[in-house]
Amino acid sequence: MNPGYRGRFAPSPTGPLHFGSLVGALASWLDARAHGGTWLVRIEDLDGPRTVPGAADDILATLAHFGMTPDEPPIWQSTRDAAYTAALERLVAAGLVYPCGCTRKEIADSLRAAHERHTTLAYPGTCRTGLHGKPARAWRLRVPDGNDAVVTFDDRWQHAQSQNLATEVGDFVLKRADGQWAYQLAVVVDDADAGITHVVRGADLLDSTARQIYLQRCLGVPTPAYLHVPVVVDANGEKLSKQTGATALERDDPLPALRAAAAHLGLAADGDRPVHTIDAFYAAATDAWARRFGPRAG
């Protein structure tokens, strides 16, 4: 094992594991194994209304049937309120966040007006200077202006990336109006506390990465290496998800789905001859992954 490498797969328990999720799980698992590292599973169950009872246990059981068992006990976001609160308090003390009283309608109206004026569609910073008599609803992280707003990073699959937080995003929410923690804060705190060094996930989250890197800088925590794999889409070109009718994986015969997931990732996991066991598949797939993303040699 390489104690310096720590990766993770972070599903939301909104339903059973489907093929699109399998691609993400497989990519993160292969990267961890190719590097001789530790692979974790984090259950992202913060969104109470969307969480399906029993779905998390079903996801973990399906992963086990497919030969992917985490190296440490799963992490549950729903148990980590104190960690998120402590992070927000640090940002408040540093003057980096502010309460926001804007409703969704007010923000939508501002963005619509900006669109009509052909100006930025980012959150306009209405509450930066105060609530103006409105009750506090959410907490936002203040993003910098000018050149300091540009976050660049090199993605291991998607290559050079750049985003101007001021013009493309605006001050973003860390705690929502309904009291729930926002995805960006929870992910950054969880990755830091778990010592995650490598994040492998779907390209639908590529747009979130610059925000997470900026938040990591604000909290003074390390930035992992990022790799965003192509997402699986349905016949209409929509991301395959539970919301678009993705069906649960068949546990009885994992190999066909694993081969299809490897093919989606551009891996010739069978090599010159077909493999007939899960162990043989993973050995071949890990070698194929390492040839692209290293460093299994030795």
Swiss-Prot record:
Zn(2+) binds at residues 100, 102, 123, 127. Binds 1 zinc ion per subunit. It is an enzyme of class 6 (ligase). A motif ('KMSKS' region) lies at residues 239-243. One of its GO terms (biological process) is tRNA modification. ATP binds at residue 242. Its cofactor is Zn(2+). Keywords: Aminoacyl-tRNA synthetase, ATP-binding, Ligase, Metal-binding, Nucleotide-binding, Zinc. Pfam families: tRNA-synt_1c. L-glutamate binds at residues 8-12, 44, 183, 201. Its EC number is 6.1.1.-. A motif ('HIGH' region) lies at residues 11-21. One of its GO terms (cellular component) is cytosol. InterPro entries: Glu-Q_tRNA(Asp)_Synthase (IPR022380), Glu/Gln-tRNA-synth (IPR000924), Glu/Gln-tRNA-synth_Ib_cat-dom (IPR020058), GluQ/Sye (IPR049940), Rossmann-like_a/b/a_fold (IPR014729). Gene3D superfamilies: HUPs. One of its GO terms (molecular function) is ATP binding. Catalyzes the tRNA-independent activation of glutamate in presence of ATP and the subsequent transfer of glutamate onto a tRNA(Asp). Glutamate is transferred on the 2-amino-5-(4,5-dihydroxy-2-cyclopenten-1-yl) moiety of the queuosine in the wobble position of the QUC anticodon. Belongs to the class-I aminoacyl-tRNA synthetase family. GluQ subfamily. This is Glutamyl-Q tRNA(Asp) synthetase. It comes from Burkholderia cenocepacia (strain ATCC BAA-245 / DSM 16553 / LMG 16656 / NCTC 13227 / J2315 / CF5610) (Burkholderia cepacia (strain J2315)).
